């Protein structure tokens, strides 16, 4: 058992907190998985019939290994965000949420819209490098760009050799970890605002 300075079991520091995950990219999903590691209840909102796009990330050979890693400590809610009956469900869920982990997918915005003015969740909104300016950097949302721009690719490969793309989305993992750190500070301070 790992304890922080207060004597609280670190694995349960987020016990009683609700995290809603609405994402198609690894960064926000990894942040939500870390929140689950610390005891938060994490609910992944997935569109039927195939679920989150993260279930199919990468080549078919890695699907079976990838999803259990990113979906650990989470529960899944199959919900069609465009269905009229989804709004009351999202409103109830959003009213209880402490944190919404989302990316540029439209469904994440619908969860926050459902919360309306009564929403009190910290909004952890992550998006790929360059997604805010696709007119300038149409290719910059690719994970290879993020790994190169962040310096992650320079840390891999042979000395004096070319850079090597890591097997895992290392830049996404770092972004998710940093975003969750900011969100935890916001939760600790009791502030509810856009934090990443």
Model-flagged regions — what are they?
Residues 1-194:
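N-terminal helix-loop segment corresponding to the beta1-alpha1 unit
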């Amino acid at each position: 058992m790992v304890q922080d300075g207060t004597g609280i079991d670190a694995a349960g520091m987020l016990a009683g907190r609700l995290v809603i995950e609405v994402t198609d990219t690894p960064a926000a999903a990894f942040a939500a998985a870390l929140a689950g590691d610390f005891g938060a209840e994490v609910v992944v909102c997935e569109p039927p019939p195939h679920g989150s796009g993260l279930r199919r990330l990468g080549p078919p050979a890695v699907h079976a290994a990838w999803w259990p890693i990113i979906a650990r400590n989470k529960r899944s809610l199959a919900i069609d965000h465009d269905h009229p009956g989804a709004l009351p469900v999202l409103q109830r869920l959003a009213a209880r949420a402490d944190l919404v982990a989302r990316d540029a997918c439209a469904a994440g915005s619908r969860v926050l819209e459902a919360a309306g003015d009564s929403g009190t969740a910290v909004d952890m909104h992550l998006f790929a490098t360059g997604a805010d300016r696709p007119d300038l950097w149409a290719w910059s949302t690719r994970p290879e760009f993020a790994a190169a721009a962040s310096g992650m690719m320079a840390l891999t490969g042979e000395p004096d050799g070319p850079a090597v793309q890591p097997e895992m989305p290392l830049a996404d993992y770092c972004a998710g970890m940093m975003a969750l750190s900011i969100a935890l500070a916001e939760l600790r301070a009791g502030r509810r605002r856009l934090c990443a």
